[in-house]
Amino acid sequence: MLITLLLVLIYVDDIFVTDSDVKLIAQVIQDLNVQFSLKSLGSLQYFLGFEAHRTATGLTLTQTKYVWDLLVKTNMTIFKPCPTPLSPNYKLSATEGIIFADATLYKCTMGALQYLTLTIPNISFSVNKLSQFLASPTQSQWESVLRYI
């Protein structure tokens, strides 16, 4: 008995259907098209901030465009990357320092970094540590956030 796993990913008006059986994919799309007006964009290239690259062994997901958009949004396109992770012993104070002027920017940037941990898991510790200061971020915490962009 052949077991197959058909994946149908739906987000708002984007649908991605995949399976190893091309005929099954075509049938599902045909069935969906009876109820909904579908427009095929061909093979998956970009979905929810992820670029998809098909290889001989499977599918590789990256977030290169998402990272670049984040660099542009935070005016960090001219800086060199900092490969050093945040030390577990590094102390960030929740009460000391100048309050960061744009708490919304801090929160949005931290959300974007959280999303990036899906494809860049080695920043997870640092991002989670810096997420502790969402309520009232300071300038020094913001500068620490900029290391990971």
Per-segment meaning from a language model:
Residues 1-149:
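Long, low-complexity, charge-biased intrinsically disordered regions
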